[in-house]
């Protein structure tokens, strides 16, 4: 995106500062570059990183998947699919949206239940909570794996141990 100094000044005057300018073409290019580099990976965009509905819409239109951590984040994504035929909408929810908050509030699970979401869990207690408050959810067990050689140790933070998974 090329903006002249005068254009930036005018935008600041018209909209006040601070002012955030988002180039949706750059978002699309970055997404395509990522998919080209890792074609078999289905990455999920963390909506909490930037929940701007226009960014989510841009990513939706180019086939992105979404990681949501709250009901409002889910609804930002859902706005893009609410008018799809029912089966297509449900297929999108199961294939392209995952509720992966590590601490799942029972209220949020109840709000999500009618949408039959895909939900991660790390242990048997979480699975029981999901079953009670969001019985229509699909579930995905998050596995804790060693990350030997990583610069930042995160493997002890999330997921079930191998012995717990069986």
Tell what function each PLM region has.
Residues 1-119, 124-136:
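A charged N-terminal "starter" segment
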Residues 115-116, 122-166:
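Conserved anion-binding
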């Amino acid at each position: 995106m090329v903006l002249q100094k005068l254009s930036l000044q005018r935008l600041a005057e018209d909209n006040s500062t601070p002012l955030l300018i988002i180039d949706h073409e750059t978002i699309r290019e970055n997404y395509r570059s990522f998919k080209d580099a890792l074609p078999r990976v289905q990455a999920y965009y963390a909506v909490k990183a930037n929940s701007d509905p226009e960014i989510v819409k841009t990513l939706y239109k180019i086939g992105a998947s979404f990681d949501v951590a709250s009901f409002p984040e889910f609804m930002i994504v859902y706005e893009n699919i609410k008018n799809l035929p029912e089966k297509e909408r449900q297929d999108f929810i199961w294939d392209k949206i995952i509720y992966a908050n590590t601490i799942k509030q029972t209220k949020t699970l109840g709000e999500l239940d009618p949408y039959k979401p895909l939900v991660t869990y790390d242990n048997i207690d979480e699975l029981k909570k999901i079953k009670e408050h969001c019985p229509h959810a699909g579930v995905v067990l998050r596995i804790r794996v060693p990350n030997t050689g990583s610069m930042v140790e995160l493997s002890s933070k999330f997921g079930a141990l191998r012995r717990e998974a069986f």
